[in-house]
Amino acid sequence: MKKKFSWGIPVLGTYVIYLVLVLLGFTRGLHGIGTAALFERNATLMTPMTYAFYGIPVVTVIGLVLMIGQLAPVRGAGERSYEGMQWMLLGSNIVSIIWILTWHFEKKIVAFIAMVLLLLFLSLAYMSALRYTLERRRATWMRMILGIWIGQTIFLTVESLSSVLRFAGMHTESNQLYGVLFLVLATLVTLLYTVGQREFLLGLVSGFYMFGVFMRHILVLRFNYVSVSIISLLMVGILVVSLIECVRKNLAKPKRCPKDRREEDTRKEDTRVEEKREAIQRVEEKPEVFQVKEEEDHVNPAQPS
């Protein structure tokens, strides 16, 4: 329990700080830019997602608490992957704080560097989580990670489609695309809640919200649609490949490594030795029973068939 507590406090604490800064940026602004003024200057931000963003702190904190709360103390197998994942989560939270502060104070270059580092940290965290799940197949919280991945993929797909159409000169409104997206999300929420996959549901919604903030605030406002299209499509490809690989490996029958085979052979040999020892002990405890049995076999030998 000590390892679990010591990891949970810094990871959750830094994430809460980041969420508070995001909420302040929405409501008051850290550089004299209020929420109303921000949306007045950027009419394309007025989508259904705008109102859903106010649920980010609650949904994401609940999801993170659930994910960390289900991580049992690790002993032996998977310990290195577990610690690596927690280091990456902690690093991504710290970078997120730097990113949101530099963006609000209009340090564009620093914010862009922090954005790239954030993607790197999160990618490494997901890779470590995947390795940990493959090593400890009872880690049910992996559904949370899969939900986050799928939530990001859904958002990036719609964002990429919108930016590509606009770059091609076609008139498109993000509101229409996000309207369809929210219908899809509403259907998934209803389905997942009905079948009881609440971990997966929280991961899906949290991933959609978190990456939605990232894309709309940094890429769309600070760069052009060409950059959005390239980065979004690249990320969609990476996430889809990661999901396919993750599902394939988790569904595949685990292969025994040479060390596992040696351990199994050792256990079988120990079992045979123990059975022989028990048989000898039974003979020593009741020798008369076995003596009578031998005499009967000598007097009445088995008839050949």
Segments predicted by a language model, with ranges:
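Short aromatic-rich membrane-water interface segments that cap or initiate transmembrane helices
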Residues: E40-G55, T140-W149, M170-Q176
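Membrane-interface capping segments at transmembrane-helix boundaries
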Residues: A72-P73, S128-T133, L243-K259
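Membrane-interface helix caps and helix-loop-helix hairpins in membrane proteins
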Residues: W99-I113, R166-E173, T194-Q197, I218-N224
